[in-house]
Curated annotation (Swiss-Prot):
GO terms for cellular component: cytoplasm. GO terms for molecular function: N-acetyl-gamma-glutamyl-phosphate reductase activity; NAD binding; NADP+ binding. Keywords: Amino-acid biosynthesis, Arginine biosynthesis, Cytoplasm, NADP, Oxidoreductase. This is N-acetyl-gamma-glutamyl-phosphate reductase. Its main location: cytoplasm. Catalyzes the NADPH-dependent reduction of N-acetyl-5-glutamyl phosphate to yield N-acetyl-L-glutamate 5-semialdehyde. It is found in: Cytoplasm. The gene is argC.
């Protein structure tokens, strides 16, 4: 019996990415697709490359209950939570790719996203970063899929934080992301003429992913961590490269040894040998993350570099990895593809 899957928000970039990967997943049958903008039309007519002749509909909780074992919600922040609440008592698993289920402390969501999450404590949700919370994910029904920047930053810093090897509790992050991270916004800033041939910082210091990153770092480190974050938009479709600066007394060899051991058994996380630096092209279209490091012995500063595909490990691929865990499948099921060049 295949897993019956629904995708809410199927025509956005993360929804389409879910569709691209799930249609080739050997244990999945796609049974429900929703889209407010294209309700009543066939997915195949809107996006012929999808090769799925399913009628798109507006979100219908009764239809979801009747036709799905797991639902991916690829919706704007603030919309998913009401759906999760309405399905809370059903024998259904929900993986939210938005921000609504990411926070342990709902007051952070309220402060940064401007909405109160009523009865949040009744939703037994788990932060869906498998490399750190695998056992918790397996026992849950509600998964808050991490943001793209948090995934790239947390995986790159977790070994140091977990071992309490950070000095001074401060981390500086410079991240560069492809334009698909902004979704399908019809704004001048994301138009071809504005993006092409240009590099632009945005939401410096006050990006909405900062509280998510800091909350998770505190959970891993068992102490407050301050993140100074400067994201940049680069003229490419997909991919994130994060360069992270932090103080640690580990030597270069100790740093490499720590990371190699920490991620030794992880299929999707690759620790590169010294002096090898990753390219976003390596992770393009795949669920793989590449991490490299360099130690500045003069200043006791470690420079960590991570790359991933913001639409895959930063969103839809990680969501499928979480689904595989929930249903006791191999984590790489349906996720073994890569694209190069």
């Amino acid at each position: 019996m295949k897993i019956r899957v629904g995708i809410l928000g199927a025509t956005g970039y993360t929804g389409l990415e879910l569709l691209r990967m799930l249609k080739n997943h050997p244990q999945v049958k796609i049974t429900y697709l929703s889209s407010n903008n294209f309700s009543g039309q066939s997915m195949k007519d809107i996006y012929p490359f999808a090769e799925i002749d399913i009628l798109l509909s507006k979100i219908d909780v009764k239809e979801i209950k009747a036709n799905c074992d797991v639902v991916f919600t690829a919706l704007p922040a603030g919309i998913s939570y009401d759906i999760v609440k309405s399905l809370r008592d059903e024998n259904l698993k929900i993986i939210d790719l938005g921000a609504d289920l990411r926070f342990d402390d709902p007051s952070l969501y309220e402060k940064w996203y401007g909405r109160t999450l009523q009865d949040y404590g009744l939703i037994k949700r788990v932060y869906g970063l498998p490399e750190l919370y695998r056992s918790e994910i397996k026992e849950s029904r509600f998964i808050g899929n991490p943001g793209c920047y948090p995934t790239s930053i947390l995986l790159a810093t977790a070994p140091i934080l977990k071992r309490k090897l950070l000095v001074n509790g401060e981390i500086i992050v410079d991240s560069k992301s492809g334009v698909s991270g902004a979704g399908k916004k019809e704004e001048l800033a994301y138009s071809f003429c504005e993006i092409d041939g240009s590099l632009k910082p945005y939401s410096v210091i006050n990006h909405k992913h900062v509280p998510e990153i800091q909350e998770q770092m505190k959970k891993i480190y068992h102490s407050e961590v301050t993140v100074i974050f400067a994201p940049h938009l680069v003229p490419m479709v997909r991919g994130i490269l994060s360069t992270i600066y932090l103080k640690t007394r580990l030597s270069a060899d100790e740093l490499y040894g720590l990371y190699s051991e920490f991620y030794r058994d992880e299929y999707f996380v690759h620790v590169l040998k010294p002096a090898i630096y990753p390219s976003t092209k390596w992770s393009y279209g795949s669920n793989h993350v590449f991490i490299s490091m360099k130690k500045d012995e003069r200043t006791d500063t470690a420079v960590l570099i991570s790359v991933l595909d913001n639409l895959v490990k930063g969103a839809s691929g990680q969501a499928i990895q979480n689904m595989n865990i929930l249903f006791s499948l191999r984590e790489d099921t349906g996720l073994t593809f890569t694209v190069y060049p």
